Amino acid sequence: MKSIVIFGGAGFVGKHLIRRLTKNGHKIIVPYQRSVQEAKIRLLGVTGQVIPFRYSSLEDKRLKSVLNNTDICINLKTTYDQKKGDFNNTIYKFNQKLIRILKSSKELKQFILFSGLGVDIDKNSTRSIAVHKSEKEAFKQLDNAIIIRPGVIIGGGDIFLKRLLPIFKSSFFVPLF
C-alpha cells in the first residue's frame, strides 16, 4: 500500500482520482489550506484510508514530515484565486517551494504535476506562463517528475455542467455525453 499526497484533492479531478486510488488500496493524504468539507473527503475511501490534512504554508513542519514519509506527491493545484488572479504566486511559487521540499527529502519522491490544457510559454496568458515555468522547474530539479497535460474535463458533479443545466432545461436540444 503506497502513501500518496494529493494537493488539490478536494477538487473535481482530485475526488475522482482519490476514488480510483483508494479502490487500489492506497493511503491518501489531502493537504488543504482553505475550508473543505472533511467528511466528504474522508468518505471517498474506507475509514482511515483518506486523511484530510490542514496546513498553513509549505513551510509547515508537519506538512514537511508528511511529504518526507510519502511515496508519491501529486499536485492538481494549478488553478488560481479567481478574485486576485495572481498566477505567479498561486501556481509557480507554490510549485517551486513544493519541488524544493521534495528535492531536499531523504527519499526522492515521484512527483506528478497536473498541468493545463494548451500550456505554452509563448501565450499571452499569465496563467499559462506560470504553469509552463512550473513544468520547467519540475523537470530541472527532479529526475522523476511527470507532467500530465489534460484535455477538457467535464463530468458528473462538475461546476461547468451545473451552470449549463438551466440552459439545457429550457432548450429543445439535449447534449449527449
Would you name each region that the model predicts?
Residues 166-177:
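A conserved pocket-lining segment of Rossmann-fold NAD(P)-dependent short-chain dehydrogenase/reductase
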Residues 155-163:
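Glycine/proline-rich active-site loop of Rossmann-fold NAD(P)-dependent oxidoreductases
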Residues 79, 93-141, 145-151:
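Conserved Rossmann-fold NAD(P)-dependent oxidoreductase catalytic core, especially the SDR/UDP-sugar
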